[in-house]
């Protein structure tokens, strides 16, 4: 519905940055179509300025942002607040909202759309986010970096560039960056193929570990740091991929075998903690109390012990991962037997990527029809398990019709950042959502950029978004020098023992 509004010049001629609110306009009861869609989202008080533009054809746009006594008017087709303006607006709206009014001109006629709010939570978010930037392809994986972005502004820097140690046929791939308790000074990532090894940085010291050993299935893959011990649990995976010609899921990444191992960073010792040949364990994650390890596992028994690969490909739809946990004693470093947490196979689904909220109350995971690598599954959604009540539900308020996959909690447990392919089904972008004390999520918002159209023009996917308390200070060249060293081989032990 539209109605014509005519206001006096004295009441409406608001000026800011040379922009004016139009005197005469039609009024619409519809929300404006803007990109990114920041209508009625909830944001942390310390987030970088939200920029947006009209998503469609328009001759001009004017927007007024109001919070308390603060008011700013923007024009020129897009809203790009500077840092000082945005900070004043956010501080004035903390615990409340920034009111946004958008006026659009088409063919000489102005329309004022239904105002919307940007709710400003007093809950802050960790100031840094790291991720791997990679083309959504299996061909150009060498041209990738691990980057870090300050969430309080638009500053971005490279933690490590994969091409620093790649040399023609001697290619390399880096992956699986991970931190101990959001601490950027305690980090690990893997270098694969040429000069391969696991890089571990701990309070300024960097070492390269050769984790391959005859007593374990493979070198470590997906990691999780213990909250305070110098201990990392990894999955070990024999991984393959196939390409579909008809299925809407273009690529299927799968494990034919996988186990869990524990690695003592200080003693350089490794041991198996789950290696049942009929179970495929993956994606471990520590509970914040350091006394429980969560992971997912699929039961799969081969009928043909010789042609495993071909058999697995013909039975991929049978592979359903459930969620499990194991108790752990931090004093003795001993694990208890596994316990079932959520039987996804009972509803003909597959659950992966368990992540526990910092207060230990909620377990967020990714659910899809089958398989383990849900980033390639268009039906993948985020689900939440209340560990106190046992209730499990789909996070409909966060999910989209396309892929939602990897997710990371903020250190205060009030935010999650997650990977989504909601725009085009191909490129993975980071979205952020507020989670209240009842486990309810808010409408998610896209990572803000200085140019509102940046992500639609950027031809890389954001892979494995991880929040951090600050920036990684080690320079890319320092990591490159460590990668060029000989790897220190791990020692296999039947049982880890605490050093006294």
Placement of each model-derived feature along the sequence:
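Bacterial Sec-dependent N-terminal signal peptides
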Residues: 1-23
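Sequence signature of WD/YWTD-type beta-propeller architectures
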Residues: 17-500
């Amino acid at each position: 519905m539209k109605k014509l509004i005519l206001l006096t010049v004295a009441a409406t001629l608001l000026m800011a940055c040379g922009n004016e609110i139009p005197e005469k306009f039609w009024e619409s009861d519809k929300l404006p179509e803007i990109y990114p869609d920041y209508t009625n989202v909830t944001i942390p008080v310390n987030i970088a300025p939200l920029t947006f533009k009209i998503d469609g054809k328009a001759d001009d746009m004017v927007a007024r942002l109001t919070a308390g006594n603060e008011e700013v008017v923007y024009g020129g087709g897009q809203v790009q607040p500077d840092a000082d303006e945005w900070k004043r607006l956010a501080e004035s709206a903390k615990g409340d909202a920034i009111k946004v009014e958008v006026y659009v001109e088409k063919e000489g006629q102005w329309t004022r759309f239904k105002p919307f709010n940007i709710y400003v939570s007093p809950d802050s978010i960790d100031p840094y986010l790291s991720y791997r930037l990679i083309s959504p392809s299996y061909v150009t994986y060498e041209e990738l970096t691990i980057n870090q972005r300050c969430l309080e502004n638009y500053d971005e820097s490279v933690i490590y560039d994969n091409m620093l140690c790649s040399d023609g046929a001697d290619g390399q791939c880096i992956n699986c960056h991970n931190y101990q308790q959001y601490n950027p000074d305690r980090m690990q990532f893997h270098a694969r193929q040429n000069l391969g090894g696991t890089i571990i940085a701990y309070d300024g010291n960097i070492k390269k570990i050769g984790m391959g050993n005859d007593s374990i299935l493979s070198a470590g893959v997906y990691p999780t740091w213990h909250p305070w011990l110098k201990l990392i649990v990894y999955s070990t995976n024999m991984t393959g991929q196939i390409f579909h010609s008809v299925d809407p899921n273009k690529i299927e990444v799968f494990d034919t075998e996988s186990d869990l191992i524990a690695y003592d960073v200080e003693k350089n010792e490794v041991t198996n903690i789950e290696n049942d040949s009929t179970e495929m364990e993956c994606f471990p994650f520590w509970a914040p109390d350091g006394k429980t390890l969560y992971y997912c596992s699929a039961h799969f028994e081969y009928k043909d012990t010789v042609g495993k690969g071909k058999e697995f490909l013909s039975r991929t739809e049978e592979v359903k991962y459930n969620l499990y946990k194991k108790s752990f004693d931090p004093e003795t470093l001993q694990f208890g037997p596994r316990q079932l947490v959520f039987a996804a196979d009972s509803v003909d689904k597959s659950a992966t990527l368990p992540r526990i909220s910092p207060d230990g109350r909620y377990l967020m995971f990714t659910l899809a029809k089958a398989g383990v690598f849900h980033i390639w599954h268009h039906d993948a959604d985020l689900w939440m398990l209340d560990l106190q009540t046992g209730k499990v539900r789909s996070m409909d308020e966060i999910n989209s019709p396309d892929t939602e996959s990897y997710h990371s909690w903020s250190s205060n447990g009030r935010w999650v950042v997650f990977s989504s392919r909601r725009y085009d089904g191909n490129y993975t972008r980071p979205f952020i959502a507020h989670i209240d004390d009842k486990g309810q999520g808010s409408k998610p918002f896209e990572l803000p950029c200085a140019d509102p159209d940046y992500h639609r023009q950027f031809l890389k996917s954001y892979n494995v978004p991880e929040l951090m308390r600050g920036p990684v200070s080690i320079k890319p060249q320092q990591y490159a020098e460590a990668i060029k060293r000989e790897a220190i081989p791990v020692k296999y032990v039947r049982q880890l023992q605490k050093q006294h």
